[in-house]
């Protein structure tokens, strides 16, 4: 296989690898969102993101998934969005202890939505083997104070922020992002 073919194959694999971590149309419908609230990132945008990401990280390290999400979010929108992303074990960047606001600027909130303390405490033993069994939700919302995040309070925080997010979406026509099929 030539170097060019290897690069092409690598990018294709990376696309497949990243696709699964964004909300699907079914999830959009579940939350009562119509087509106008779903922004699809087209193949050209996605390919561009993948190429940039691959120059920053070595596939398939866990950081690739978060970098992809961050790149696409920061370069694709200014409005509120809810995006399904991978939960990366042992990655402090993904699970900050708190969320701080800076003069009411928009903040990013990462929350574990699927598992409780005992499973999270398996961090060291579980490692990468169960990485793909996890997910977390990134909520982009305006917060006015520092709020601690813990597994026991996550559901309440998530529900509160999602309600605020949906209200803001109705007011500003924010979007839920997903990748369109290749």
Curated annotation (Swiss-Prot):
Coiled coil: none annotated. The lineage of its organism: Eukaryota, Fungi, Dikarya, Ascomycota, Saccharomycotina. One of its GO terms (biological process) is meiotic DNA double-strand break formation. One of its GO terms (cellular component) is condensed nuclear chromosome. InterPro entries: Rec104 (IPR035349). Signal peptide: none annotated. The gene is REC104. Interacts with REC114 and SPO11. Keywords: Activator, Meiosis, Transcription, Transcription regulation. Potential transcriptional regulator that is required to activate expression of a number of early meiotic genes including HOP1. This is Meiotic recombination protein REC104.
